[in-house]
Amino acid sequence: MASPHRLLKDYQQLLSLSQKILHLAVNGQWDTLVEQEIVYVQSVEGLVNTPIPDEIDSVMRLHLRQILQEVMDNEAKVKQLLQKRMDELSSLMGQSLKQKSINTTYNEFAGQRMLPGDALPDETRS
């Protein structure tokens, strides 16, 4: 069973990771965020498996609760930023697919007469 001091240190470390991840999301550093997310999840798993001792006083419990609330608030903000990024990427993918479709269509008609009397590209060289 973890000592109250060790438990507080672990919760503060989780909060620090949470703040770092939020900072990375705000600054659009997605690759680094993904790397840190692994460490964050491991930290959360470690805390989930660490029981809170019964002898922790109410002040310490309140402090731990406040830390957890801030971590959850940070997670909500990161989730919003991730959703915004996913929407941006989805839009970019849609634009890319439209551009590919347009390019494919133009390539299909390359070398063809589009209007009556138009010369083919090979006919203009004579």
Swiss-Prot record:
The keyword Repeat does not apply. One of its GO terms (biological process) is negative regulation of bacterial-type flagellum assembly. Residues 60-98 are annotated as: FliD binding. InterPro entries: FliT. Its main location: cytoplasm. One of its GO terms (cellular component) is cytosol. It is found in: Cytoplasm, Cytosol. It comes from the Bacteria. Transmembrane segments: none annotated. Residues 1-50 are annotated as: Required for homodimerization. Keywords: Bacterial flagellum biogenesis, Chaperone, Cytoplasm, Repressor, Transcription, Transcription regulation. Belongs to the FliT family. Homodimer. Interacts with FliD and FlhC. Dual-function protein that regulates the transcription of class 2 flagellar operons and that also acts as an export chaperone for the filament-capping protein FliD. As a transcriptional regulator, acts as an anti-FlhDC factor; it directly binds FlhC, thus inhibiting the binding of the FlhC/FlhD complex to class 2 promoters, resulting in decreased expression of class 2 flagellar operons. As a chaperone, effects FliD transition to the membrane by preventing its premature polymerization, and by directing it to the export apparatus. This is Flagellar protein FliT. The gene is fliT.
